[in-house]
Amino acid sequence: MSIVVKNNIHWVGQRDWEVRDFHGTEYKTLRGSSYNSYLIREEKNVLIDTVDHKFSREFVQNLRNEIDLADIDYIVINHAEEDHAGALTELMAQIPDTPIYCTANAIDSINGHHHHPEWNFNVVKTGDTLDIGNGKQLIFVETPMLHWPDSMMTYLTGDAVLFSNDAFGQHYCDEHLFNDEVDQTELFEQCQRYYANILTPFSRLVTPKITEILGFNLPVDMIATSHGVVWRDNPTQIVELYLKWAADYQEDRITIFYDTMSNNTRMMADAIAQGIAETDPRVAVKIFNVARSDKNEILTNVFRSKGVLVGTSTMNNVMMPKIAGLVEEMTGLRFRNKRASAFGSHGWSGGAVDRLSTRLQDAGFEMSLSLKAKWRPDQDALELCREHGREIARQWALAPLPQSTVNTVVKEETSAATTADLGPRMQCSVCQWIYDPAKGEPMQDVAPGTPWSEVPDNFLCPECSLGKDVFDELASEAK
């Protein structure tokens, strides 16, 4: 099946609804992906890219339904990665002498994957052109390290279509091809996820390369990407977003992520978040347990944030493995213009938080004070966590904080209500976790100020997951 992109340009790619892992298991493609290949039929017939190698046979068969393979005059490979050029071996077995136009670096990559140095390679550089008849040309633009050394874009004159390779794409599968036909919220979420997780390390190259392309003064009516939608409605909107994202991007947002062995570090994360929100209600705060969350969603939130707080328990004097792995990945992504703070709990010996602070600094984050707690944090320790959050909110504020005494008044009233109206704290008889009515249990939607009698019957202890029936009134408060 083919789809008309514009005039004599047809999409002949492959949708992949089922793919859930990309680049090994490093990128979760929760909404599938597509491998976009384009057939241009002018006086000369040109195929731009192929599809992922696992669809090689289907691709060649479908292409054969569109055109006699012997009538393909040129093959353009914008990128040699296997999700772009994976079907080359299957295709070239049918038309082995067809010229392949690509960068010099692409020849090395293609031969490294396909092992056919005898293919008819033709090296192109920025500004080189290829006449395809009917007054039209292909213009080639090298884009090294966006995101491989071999990468390039191809522009078709006359139709004013930019075949942009990985740039401006997204791992997003939909039966509709064009950007104005799909769910806009989904689309732009996937665009940002794609940029944050794949292109962020190369942000310093994005702006000059876009500027170079714009310097050709060529009209762009469409941007035909290698993955996801074709931008036909206001195609420059995604270009403008890339320029914004490449410029040390941040929002008024803080991301907290952690791993924990006994929920102690989780308790710290919750209290820190409470302190941040109490001091700066304008800032968006998101908390993730790395063991239970989509890693790429965490990294996308880090990309959006002005700062991150990373928490870990201490295990064998070092940080938890999932935290170590995620920090290593952040190092590779080379985030800029972001602050960080490390926190965590430990038992008889620490070490993880200091190690984590060093790793975050090495990753390029501007470091703020770290925070440690021994064993399970008690009420005093949790208050220190909240105060840490308040201080973070003050230090990281992008604008002057609101001058208000509301929080102070509310805090005084809540404190009075805790002792006068909310009843005693309750302690789990199994693990000793304490429910404080003044603080509630946000992870189970129990709001601060909820007395034990109003806590839902399906409440479970956050530590041992047992029900309300194992709780007793805290001994020190029993009458």
Curated annotation (Swiss-Prot):
Primary localisation category: cytoplasm
Subcellular location: Cytoplasm
Cofactor binding remark: Binds 3 Fe cations per monomer.
Limits of the Rubredoxin-like domain: 423-474
Pathway(s) of this molecule: Nitrogen metabolism; nitric oxide reduction
Record region (Zinc metallo-hydrolase): 30-210
Every Flavodoxin-like domain range: 254-393
Native source species: Escherichia coli O6:H1 (strain CFT073 / ATCC 700928 / UPEC)
Cofactors that this protein relies on: Fe cation; FMN
Family: In the N-terminal section; belongs to the zinc metallo-hydrolase group 3 family.
SUPFAM superfamilies: Flavoproteins, Metallo-hydrolase/oxidoreductase, Rubredoxin-like
Record-given protein name: Anaerobic nitric oxide reductase flavorubredoxin
Positions bound to Fe cation 3: C428, C431, C461, C464
Amino-acid positions noted as binding Fe cation 2 in the UniProt annotation, renumbered to this chain: D83, D166, H227
UniProt entry tagged with the keyword RNA-binding: no
Record-linked SMART domains: Lactamase_B (SM00849)
One CC-aspect GO term: cytoplasm
HAMAP family membership: NorV
Cross-referenced PROSITE patterns: FLAVODOXIN_LIKE (PS50902), RUBREDOXIN_LIKE (PS50903)
Protein purpose: Anaerobic nitric oxide reductase; uses NADH to detoxify nitric oxide (NO), protecting several 4Fe-4S NO-sensitive enzymes. Has at least 2 reductase partners, only one of which (NorW, flavorubredoxin reductase) has been identified. NO probably binds to the di-iron center; electrons enter from the NorW at rubredoxin and are transferred sequentially to the FMN center and the di-iron center. Also able to function as an aerobic oxygen reductase.
Assembly mode: Homotetramer.
Keywords: Cytoplasm, Electron transport, Flavoprotein, FMN, Iron, Metal-binding, Oxidoreductase, Transport
InterPro entries xrefs: Anaer_NO_rdtase_flvorubredoxin, Flavodoxin/NO_synth, Flavoprotein-like_sf, Metallo-B-lactamas, ODP_dom, RibonucZ/Hydroxyglut_hydro, Rubredoxin-like_dom, Rubredoxin-O_OxRdtase
Entry binding sites for Fe cation 1: H79, E81, H147, D166
Binding site for FMN: 260-264, 342-369
